[in-house]
Each structure stands twice: as C-alpha cells, then as structure tokens.
Regions:
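C-terminal juxtamembrane segment of a hydrophobic transmembrane alpha-helix
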Residues: 17-41
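Perimembrane helix-loop junctions in membrane proteins
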Residues: 36-39, 43, 59, 63
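Conserved G/P- and acidic residue-centered "switch" motifs that form tight phosphate/ATP-binding loops
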Residues: 15, 47
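Flexible, glycine- and charge-enriched loops at secondary-structure boundaries
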Residues: 7, 36, 128
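N-terminal hydrophobic or amphipathic segments with adjacent small-residue motifs
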Residues: 4-5, 23, 44
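N-terminal leader/signal peptides at the extreme start of proteins
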Residues: 1-9
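Short, conserved structural patches
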Residues: 48-227
Length: 227
C-alpha cells in the first residue's frame, strides 16, 4: 500500500494536461495578436492613401466646391476670407458651417449631410468608389479586385469635408477644404483564440450589419484639398 502511494508514474500526464493547453493558448494567441496588429496597421495605412486620393479627386459632396456667395460678398472678389491680424472669419466668404459635409453609404445609395448631393457617377469618375477601391487594395492586398470578400466595404467608409477658413472670395475651384477619410465599424476575427475560448463578440453599438468580432477603433486621416 505504501509503495502504491509513492508511485509517481502518472505524474507526467497530469503535468502535461496542465502545461499543454497553456502552451497552445500562448502560441496561437501570439499568432492572433500578430494578425490583429497587421489589420490595425493596414486599416490605418488605407485611410492615409484614401485621403491622398480624395484631395485630388472630384468631391463626393458634389456642390461643395461651388460655394454660394451673396451679392455683397461677390463684390469683395479677391479679398481674403479671414482677418489677417486675428485670423478669424471676416464675413467675406460663406460661413464655414455651410461648407461641411459627411458622406456615407446607405442601403439605398450614398448620402451627404448639410444638403449636399452624394456624387458617385461615371461623369465624375466615381469618386466614392475610386477612393474605396484604392483603400481595399491596401487593406486586402492578398485579394484581387473586385474585393467582394474584403472586410472593408462601402458601409465602413466616410468621406468628410470642412472649410479651413482660408482662401479668398470667388477662388477658382472653391475654398480650401480639410478632407477626412475615416473607417468605422470594422471588426477583427480571432481565428484561433476565438474558437478555443468560444468567444462571441458582437459589433459595437451603431454598427448594425457589421460582422461579429472584436470592434476595431475608428481610423481617420485628414489632408487639405489641393488646387
């Protein structure tokens, strides 16, 4: 009986049953973490490229480069939109609030805030689609066009315009704009850890229709429009 109590022949199996699952979790967790970092970097880089392309493309908010001046403002042609001493708006140009728009994709087509027309027509070289396609080429570099299976889709993209306060009255091509390209409601799938741990992660609030998974932060890049 004493000999049986001192028998340690099965101790290796017990140690293995404790160490092996931990080893698998750490190993596969490292792989999942690396893939997550790749996704984060790719999404960030995609917004950089999207902003660069957006500032040299036709605007998605169609009329934003044709500000409406009053008769008295038109008489100030060539005058700056701001006071050179203080840097504040002097009333020579339309208010900055009227020259801003957030353009997103909706189920029935795109829409822009502030009353602007969402433009993604062939006549203007499909500005929204062109920006999206170039961003997909970065985020889903392992896929080929038309990027049907790319996690980055139209619903994730927002193109925003806002007046900078610079420029002068009746400036050709419109007043300078800060163009922001952002990604929202993106999710990341944990391929190994998610299955092993039976994680069920729902998209964050306000992201109806997004694929379930870990909610990535919002990515945004802003550049000033070119002449």
């Amino acid at each position: 009986m004493i000999k049986f109590w001192r028998d340690l022949a099965g101790s290796v199996l017990v140690e293995y049953s404790v160490v092996f699952p931990t080893f698998i979790l750490v190993t596969l967790g490292t792989v999942d973490l690396a893939l997550m970092l790749v996704d984060l970097a790719a999404a960030n880089k995609a917004t950089h490229l999207g902003a660069r392309y957006a500032i040299v493309s036709n605007p998605v908010a169609k009329e934003i480069t044709s500000p409406r001046y009053t008769v008295s403002q038109q008489q100030q042609i060539g005058q700056t939109c701001f006071d050179s001493a203080s840097g504040v708006a002097n009333g020579n140009c339309p208010p900055a609030g009227s020259l801003s728009a957030d353009c997103t994709w909706a189920a029935n087509g795109g829409r822009c805030t502030n009353g602007y027309t969402f433009d993604d027509t062939a006549a203007d070289s499909y500005p929204f689609t062109s920006i999206l396609t170039r961003m997909q080429a970065i985020y889903c570099a392992h896929l080929k066009p038309p990027y049907t299976h790319c996690p980055l889709q139209r619903e994730n993209l927002t193109v925003s315009y806002a007046a900078t306060g610079a420029g002068y009255v009746l400036r050709p091509g419109g007043l300078p704009l800060a163009v922001t390209v952002s990604l929202n409601c993106m999710t990341h799938q944990f391929y190994f850890i998610g299955a092993l741990m039976r994680w069920s992660l729902a998209p964050k609030e306000g992201c109806a229709g997004a694929v379930s998974g870990w909610s990535m932060p919002t990515f945004a890049s802003t550049l000033t429009s070119e002449d």
